[in-house]
């Protein structure tokens, strides 16, 4: 017999430039020839998440809550307005702002996480005689994640680029 299914999930986030997408599949195949049964189960999934820093001090949500609603998002020339924020400002120095323009923060930063997971199993079973069967199975579980984070130097705080890949070399086989 067989069973195959596929799924797609797409959710837009509450904050500008945030969303989550997931693609997944499941496949089960099995068969029998006389007293010999065999099969395979396979389930891969891939997801991508565009995250926005919404946590704590300096996050998009806190900045949106702390900014006065009369503070314009853009200057007359179309650039982002950072000067309406007097919170923590020292003269013309905006490097110490804990609260920034939340729209600029959401648009000038990215935090993308890609995840891949695969779970699979192959099995076989033979019945030698009624009441005595031998079953063998091999399975594996792989998970990989890639995170790419960027913060534009246009934001008044420190501009930075961060790249990271993590892996578990123990899980590799050849």
Please name every model-derived segment.
Residues 1-3, 37-41, 123, 127, ...:
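Membrane-spanning beta-strand positions in outer-membrane beta-barrel proteins
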Residues 13-20, 24-119, 135-174:
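Surface-exposed loop/interface segments of Gram-negative outer-membrane beta-barrel transport/assembly proteins
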Residues 6-10:
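Transmembrane beta-strand segments that form the barrel wall of outer-membrane beta-barrel proteins
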